[in-house]
Amino acid sequence: MSKSLGNFFTVREISEKYDLQVLRFFMLSAHYRSPLNFSAELMEAAKSGLERIITAADRLKFLMGSAKTEDMAETEAEKFAKSAEYVGNFESAMDDDFNTADAIAAVFDLVKFINTMTDEDSSKEYLENLFDRLVRLTEVLGIIVDKEDEILDSDIEALIAERQAARKEKNFARADEIR
């Protein structure tokens, strides 16, 4: 890539087309010591992969809200214990020279498990435990799957503007509160 050939992109240009979470996911999809080729097709693949993970998290939240039973059944406890294998694979990948590509593969294995081993008859405890497990793995990679916890850039910009207005009005107590 070079600027003179016209195949050079800045993060700002990429962020106009793709969410920065997609860019993060794209960059994590390769080992940090491997070269990373940028293309629109690869960014779209990263976008669909990230959406797959977020969709699984959203599905778990939906099922938690409509769960008919609270406590985990014995069969669910056995299934949940099997899902620990994916956590082990994730941790092994991260211990193997920060192999994020393999770690993401373990997350996808967990997503596949979630999609096949949960339904509207699953208990709330089972669903919550799987959700916590998914969030724990994705948070290590800096991927936000729980949109309720995500602070939007527009919210931050609004708070900055409000703080600047309070400082102009010499309302320092309010400016400090916003900070």
Task: List the predicted regions and their residue ranges.
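Structural preference for alpha-helix termini/caps and helix-kink/transition segments
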Residues: 2, 6-179
